[in-house]
Curated annotation (Swiss-Prot):
Belongs to the bacterial ribosomal protein bL25 family. Gene3D superfamilies: Ribosomal Protein L25, Chain P (2.40.240.10). It comes from Pectobacterium carotovorum subsp. carotovorum (strain PC1). PANTHER family: RIBOSOMAL PROTEIN L25/GLN-TRNA SYNTHETASE, ANTI-CODON-BINDING DOMAIN-CONTAINING PROTEIN, RIBOSOMAL PROTEIN L25_GLN-TRNA SYNTHETASE, ANTI-CODON-BINDING DOMAIN-CONTAINING PROTEIN. InterPro entries: Rbsml_bL25/Gln-tRNA_synth_N (IPR020056), Ribosomal_bL25/Gln-tRNA_synth (IPR011035), Ribosomal_bL25_short (IPR020055), Ribosomal_L25_dom (IPR029751), Ribosomal_uL5_bac-type (IPR020930). The gene is rplY. GO terms for molecular function: 5S rRNA binding; structural constituent of ribosome. The keyword Ribonucleoprotein applies. Part of the 50S ribosomal subunit; part of the 5S rRNA/L5/L18/L25 subcomplex. Contacts the 5S rRNA. Binds to the 5S rRNA independently of L5 and L18. GO terms for biological process: translation. Pfam families: Ribosomal_L25p. This is Large ribosomal subunit protein bL25. The lineage of its organism: Bacteria, Pseudomonadati, Pseudomonadota, Gammaproteobacteria, Enterobacterales.
């Protein structure tokens, strides 16, 4: 099973997201189930490497959010228009 490390986002908004992306990270969100939605940040290069694996979109993944493991599936992916970059991912809890 694929494991991805994540951190809880401290800042929200367009400016904070742009700073994340320029630092080699990007924003994401985890929602669903009985818990509240959680905004997270992911390392772009590590997620891009995991995305190339066969089971990234079809199977459950494990997100390690500040040490707490959550089982999720990819709900939606947003990409840059012409660069090979991820800009945002929505995860839904399994």
């Amino acid at each position: 099973m694929i494991t991805i490390k994540a951190e809880v986002r401290k800042d929200q908004g367009k400016g904070a997201s742009r700073r994340l992306r320029s630092a080699g990270k990007f924003p994401a969100i985890v929602y669903g189930g009985s818990e509240a939605p959680v905004s997270i940040e992911l390392d772009h290069d590590s997620v891009k490497n995991q995305e190339a694996k066969e089971g990234f979109y079809g199977t459950a993944l494990i997100l390690s959010i500040d040490g707490k493991e959550v089982q999720v599936k990819v709900q939606a992916v947003q990409r840059h228009v012409y660069k090979p970059k991820l800009t945002h991912i929505d995860f839904v809890r399994v």
